[in-house]
Amino acid sequence: MTTSATSGTGPADPAGPTENSMRRALKRARDGVALDASEAAVLLQARGAHLDALTASAARVRDAGLEAAGRPGVITYSKSVFVPLTRLCRDKCHYCTFVTVPGKLRRAGHGMFMSPDEVLDIARKGAALGCKEALITLGDKPEDRWPEAREWLDAHGYDDTIAYVRAVSIRILEETGLLPHLNPGVMTWTDFQRLKPVAPSMGMMLETTATRLWSEPGGPHHGSPDKEPAVRLRVLEDAGRSSVPFTSGILIGIGETYEERAESLFALRRVSRSYHGIQELIIQNFRAKPDTAMRGMPDAELDELVAAVAVARHIMGPSACLQAPPNLVDAEYERLIGAGIDDWGGVSPLTIDHVNPERPWPQIDELAATSRAAGFELRERLCVYPEFVRRGEPWLDPRLRPHVAALADPETGLAREDAVVEGHAWQEPDEAFTATGRTDLHATIDTEGRTSDRRDDFDEVYGDWGALREAAAPGMAPERIDTDVRAALATAADDPTKLTDDEALALLHAEGPALDALCGIADDVRRSVVGDDVTYIVTRNINFTNVCYTGCRFCAFAQRRTDADAYTLSLDQVADRAQQAWEVGAVEVCMQGGIHPDLPGTAYFDIARAVKERVPGMHVHAFSPMEVVNGATRTGLSIREWLTAAKEAGLDSVPGTAAEILDDEVRWILTKGKLPAATWIEVIETAHELGIRSSSTMMYGHVDQPRHWLGHLRTLAGIQRRTGGFTEFVTLPFIHTNAPVYLAGIARPGPTLRDNRAVTAMARLLLHPHIPNIQTSWVKLGTEGAAEMLRSGANDLGGTLMEETISRMAGSSYGSYKSVKDLIAVADAAGRPAKPRTTLYGPVPEERQRAARDSDGHLPELLPVLD
């Protein structure tokens, strides 16, 4: 038997699968063997008895998953209201009737957006009927296409559509008790940070990975920038990185081939396995609508849908939650149950399906009866799936916990039958800082060490290690090139600003005598630019908390709040440490911390203000770009507004940490939820524009290669040419010992001595003449290693630190502080004089120098600071 190789609406393919290939694929599915994309494409074409066999095995997979999840024989749904916040959109999908134009809205007497009162009216009526979900759906970025949308947002005080979505969501939570499930289309990483605190779940259909349906004229997505598959896959990745429970799925029957349909499912599986964040997969069948460009296309046939559901179940596995919208079939619900679904999606007793208005939702009693006839019990869930309700952090923002807890059964995570749907205050944590946990870590890390080499949720918080190993494989061993570096050395010696990328890359690979020559050239450039003085700063690190759920895979500092080594300092403790530092000659405190979900929205302002009030003369060097973004999203301010407010609170400069490698290819292996490279650059450039100087950094020697170092340094040089705001460049060799990405067998064990010398020397040359100060890290390299870098182009030793927990938690063995005499000794070892400096590389007042000399720049005793 042979069948057509295309869907009922797809372009013609060669002859379909043979009987043997179908039987072989069915056997593999029946036996639970992993399918590949070609086998999935074969099974998508199963019909008749073959389809019956396929659905039977898919149902068994589904049943095993429900048993493992503790809800055997249960099919779920969400009782919801549909809120079409705006029907304007910048896209032009050829099958869509949801989207309209401003003129039609005006003629119908509607605004460009629903008003808050209109939204709340629907939500209140839904709450009265027992609904618990507000499905907020809207067009993509309408203000980018329609001036009327931009004017509406401006008139109502919103910077963009996402800001309005956030504001409306808060009002729904506070005034009705419904939980927002957000479908605003394509979102950026920053958008997720803004919306995560106000919505337990979000969603966006992938639809298809068939790029031709977007790129070719006449395709269903042609002319729609937000329907490019690569863009939509990036959204799914960003949702996973941000630990947002996310709903996605495919739309079948819009012209894709079976192979393309299979690839779309495998793309969803890849994201799901990498981040474990896809809470629900929707298999949606195309229904042609009048007054659209695709009105003549045939609907996807029922067998197409049933086969797609069954194949999706086999590909995604037993733990996946699989939905097919019940209003898009004609009462053939039992076939969808038989194919492996375990959810009916959102069903509203109040509102229509505004995307498919011609297809009314079935009554909940009807779904219950159909489910019961198939041997299943219909149970209500929340918009956020039970697994994520039970997991809690980092998937549920602390600000949403009380809202979800009011509606969820604590044992099952499903909706509570007796829940009263009513509003609850949504607010940032406003309790004062309280000291918790191991607040003596800064003192005891050197004597007692850390309690464990890894946090308790090691196997969960960082995503799927297997998927990461595949992505990181090219960087496990840096590539080596066989290049004559003589010409490159000659260029560097003559004028390092003329180095081409090929020459620079050759020098980054230099070894032996060539490396010695490179370091000599860099040292000559250093001498001509900043002289022989080795600068240092008397400073204290204050890491005010190590509680963090971001999931950076290189970081051994971050802990869950319940881990043995977790701690948070009070504001008084922060101020006490700053005062102690001042008394022994410090001119700066460097303050950074984990992204603690319970800190109040004003936390960073409060910290800066506490130090300035206690020690007015202290320079506050604080808050990485990641913390800046966190502060901005939590306060609802733009990055510029937040930095301005932080400056007013006492912030003097920002550390250029959280840069790692400014290449997202590497960045998304190293970090799970940290900001993208473009956002780091935005924060730094905005700070510079506001007169807030910063350092710059690069962490290297993990899953990166020299080409990444080159790109990173070129990026920093470009920023400095534009802003002039960098004070220094700091090399940060990767400390591997306790780093999760190393413990999982993915990263290299840090850079070699060759790497350190080459990076230091090339930083001097590639950043010349824009960034004159190159700092080496005694914390990471020790005194001998730091002295070697001073002979390779570096001119600065960093600070006394007084306490250091980040590198020590990672496994650095070089201690937590250095005295002034210690740092002078390092400079002596390099044959150079030492000189104190300020954060901005200015002269240190004599009074500060005297205090440092009298104390030797370190505390009399490093003991826990108690209230």
From Swiss-Prot:
The gene is fbiC. Residues 76-407 are annotated as: CofG-like. This is FO synthase. Residues 845-859 have a biased composition (Basic and acidic residues). PROSITE patterns: RADICAL_SAM. Residues 1-22, 835-867 are annotated as: Disordered. Its cofactor is [4Fe-4S] cluster. CDD domains: Radical_SAM (cd01335). Residues 75-325, 534-769 form the Radical SAM core domain. Binds 2 [4Fe-4S] clusters. The clusters are coordinated with 3 cysteines and an exchangeable S-adenosyl-L-methionine. Signal peptide: none annotated. Pathway: Cofactor biosynthesis; coenzyme F0 biosynthesis. GO terms for molecular function: 4 iron, 4 sulfur cluster binding; 5-amino-6-(D-ribitylamino)uracil--L-tyrosine 4-hydroxyphenyl transferase activity; 7,8-didemethyl-8-hydroxy-5-deazariboflavin synthase activity; metal ion binding. Pfam families: CofH_C, Radical_SAM. Catalyzes the radical-mediated synthesis of 7,8-didemethyl-8-hydroxy-5-deazariboflavin (FO) from 5-amino-6-(D-ribitylamino)uracil and L-tyrosine. Its EC number is 4.3.1.32, 2.5.1.147. It comes from Streptomyces coelicolor (strain ATCC BAA-471 / A3(2) / M145). [4Fe-4S] cluster 2 binds at C548, C552, C555. NCBIfam families: CofH family radical SAM protein, F420_cofG, F420_cofH, PRK06245.1, PRK07360.1, PRK09234.1.
